[in-house]
Each structure stands twice: as C-alpha cells, then as structure tokens.
Design a protein with these regions (language model features):
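N-terminal glycine-rich, Lys/His-bearing helix-loop that initiates the first secondary-structure elements
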Residues: 1-49
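Catalytic cores of large soluble enzymes that bind and process phosphate-bearing ligands
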Residues: 2, 57-61, 104
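Structural motif
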Residues: 26-27, 77-79, 100-101
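Conserved N-terminal alpha-helix of the aminotransferase class I/II PLP-enzyme fold
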Residues: 37-86
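Buried hydrophobic packing segments
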Residues: 87-95
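Conserved PLP-anchoring active-site segment centered on the Schiff-base-forming lysine
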Residues: 94-104
C-alpha cells in the first residue's frame, strides 16, 4: 500500500462539516431518519433524490465505507452488504435474468 492508498484508506469519503464537526467517521446507530414533509419522504423512497430512509438500506457510515472502497479500487462506486450471502444475492440478482442457469 503506497502513501496515496494509505491516505485514501484514512480520509476518502468523509468530509468534516460544521454540522458534524467530527475528525473521524462516526458510527451512526440510528434506525430511521426524519423527513421534511411527505413530499420529501416520497422523493427519497422513489429514489428521486438522494438521502437516508432506513439504516439497513443506507446510512452515512456505510456511505463512507463504500466511497473509500471505490477510491482505493479506482472505481466509480461500491456496494457494502451485511454478509457474504447478501453480496452473492446482490451480484446474482443484478447479473442474471429469467431462464439463466448457475453452475456451481
């Protein structure tokens, strides 16, 4: 791991802002988020605008992890899952279509 990779591993994806003010990435343990109004909630649930809905779907801590992994791998984005089985299911559901077969 070169110096650039070490810097990315430590800092990529996290911006210290006046509202957060944290030097290190906090571990968000909330389960749900507040919506401005019903239109805001509808836009979030329909993916018309980015934001947080429910922590098992996405949260700021996972976002930083995904951004760091993407930076380290030179990618555009990354997906963090809660388990290897979830990673396999996500991959297969993304790549396979009706009628495809898997040989294991």
């Amino acid at each position: 791991m070169n110096h650039n990779d070490q810097t990315l591993a430590l800092h990529a994806g996290h911006n210290t802002t006046k509202t957060e003010g944290t030097r290190a990435v906090p571990i968000y343990q909330t389960t749900s988020y507040v919506f401005d109004n019903t239109d805001h909630a509808a836009n979030l649930f329909s993916l018309a605008e980015p934001g947080y809905i429910y922590t098992r779907l996405n949260n700021p801590t996972a976002d930083v992890l995904e951004q760091r992994l993407a930076s380290l791998e030179g990618g555009i984005a990354a997906v963090a899952t809660s388990s290897g089985s979830a990673a396999l299911a996500t991959t297969l559901l993304t790549l396979l279509k009706t009628g495809d077969h898997i040989v294991a």
